[in-house]
Amino acid sequence: RTMLKEIYPGLRKVNCKIDYTVVNFDVEQGRIIIRENPKYLSLNEMYQVANSYPKGSKDFVNVFDIAVRMYPTDAVANLNAGAVALSQKDLDAAVKFMEKADHNTAEFINNTGVYNFLNGDINRAMAAFEQAAKLGNEAALATLKQLQQILSVKMK
């Protein structure tokens, strides 16, 4: 009884001190990690890796594919995957990803404009680009200006 009350309580207590250092993210290392073990990368790190490749390249597209598989419910991952699918004119995949994205962002509305344009609905595309441009999306504004120029030339 004495040992139980006086010795064992002291033995149960364990104090540990753990020191660790988190190294800064290196894009070159990220390129390796994303192929070997992508679960160790955050979504932001994956985005940095993707942007280290030429836009639209196979590796660029692959990183966004990995990101949406690792973070399937993340709105940003789905928005980016939807944009990549649209750039490849894969409308079915784009819709699947865009359904899971935040519908209230300028980027989503811009993607909707691209989707409508690729589907041949120019009026809905223009409306979406106008709305996205009003919300500050530069890509939508540039696309809108290009479409307006093309349409004004066709009308002449």
Segment roles from a protein language model:
Residues 1-156:
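N-terminal targeting segments with Sec-dependent signals, encompassing both cleavable signal peptides
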